[in-house]
């Protein structure tokens, strides 16, 4: 709750961060990245590891924490954690879509690499690889494999927060 509260109070609900960065600031935090971080944090909190099924039941804090006692991890399941996580994920997704982010979905991407349909990846177990459905599936597999390296300037509007290796930043 502390991380989520801090993100809400200091980052998301203030005007410190913009929704998108210009090219020269690519890789720096945005409000969309903060919302995604909040959603990921709440997903972790809702997961079985931290929501009633912690593996080490005798793991305790040596010093009592105000409001929590000696327990570091909740041993009781709380369905509301999943509700909060779902709401945060929906908010982050909608904010990203509203800001212009979208999944890169160009199934003809393979052509930009000079490949022909018969050179698309072979998928073991695919019953009819050259049927319309089979080709669409093979194109999607190719897209998922290689589009992650496609730059924003080339039309990949999927990046929300990335690490850059530019020495100037």
Sequence positions of predicted segments:
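Structured, solvent-exposed acidic/aromatic patches
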Residues: 1-168
């Amino acid at each position: 709750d502390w991380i989520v509260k801090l993100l809400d109070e200091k980052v998301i609900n203030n005007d410190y961060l913009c929704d998108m960065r210009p090219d020269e600031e690519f890789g720096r935090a945005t409000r969309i990245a903060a919302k995604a971080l909040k959603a990921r944090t709440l997903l972790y909190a809702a997961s079985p590891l931290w929501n009633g099924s912690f593996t080490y039941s005798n793991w305790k804090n040596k010093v009592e924490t105000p409001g929590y006692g000696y327990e570091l991890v909740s041993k009781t399941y709380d369905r509301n954690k999943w509700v909060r996580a779902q709401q945060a994920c929906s908010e982050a997704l909608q904010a990203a879509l509203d800001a212009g982010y979208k999944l890169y979905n160009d199934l003809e991407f393979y052509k930009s690499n000079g490949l022909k349909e018969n050179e698309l990846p072979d998928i073991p177990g695919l019953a009819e690889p050259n049927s319309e459905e089979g080709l669409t599936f093979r194109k999607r597999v190719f897209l998922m494999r290689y589009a992650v390296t496609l730059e924003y300037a080339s039309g990949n509007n999927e990046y929300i927060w990335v690490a850059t290796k530019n020495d100037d930043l």
